Amino acid sequence: MEQILIIIGVSLFGVLGTIHLVYTFSTEKFNPYDASAAEAMKRTSPQLTKETTIWRAWIGFNASHSLGVMLFAAIYIPLAINNFEVIESSLWFSLLPVVVSASYLILAKKYWFKIPFVGFLVSLVCFLFSAWLIHT
């Protein structure tokens, strides 16, 4: 049961990250409704550097966010399937998904919207229950 819960929770991360990456490059779902806002983003740079624009940074942040979530899934799915004893025997590997999903849940609540919030909440519940089963 612990293994299945980890796989379910991490698979949700992979699905959310993949959808996010597809939406970033193949749709306009992350574009602002106000076209003038997008144009302004394309014309101005962040104070950090003139080497990019707010728009290019926005696309890059969305892409790197997606890739990070997908990488988490790409590491933990095979680990849970092929070497679950590593997760079971390590406090670090059994609790890291709890910390990661709780962090994303907080971000989703504060900055994002309902779909990622629900996805990360379900993942967190899976990870918490799995960790509890492993350590009791």
Give names to the regions the model predicted.
Residues 1-8, 50-60, 85-89, 111-112:
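Membrane-interfacial loop-to-transmembrane-helix junctions in polytopic alpha-helical membrane proteins
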Residues 1-31:
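N-terminal signal-anchor transmembrane alpha helix
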Residues 81-82, 127-136:
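Juxtamembrane boundary at the C-terminal end of a transmembrane helix
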Residues 84-98:
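Structural signature of hydrophobic alpha-helical transmembrane segments
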Residues 23-31, 79, 83-86, 111:
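Perimembrane helix-loop junctions in membrane proteins
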Residues 61-76:
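Core segments of transmembrane alpha-helices
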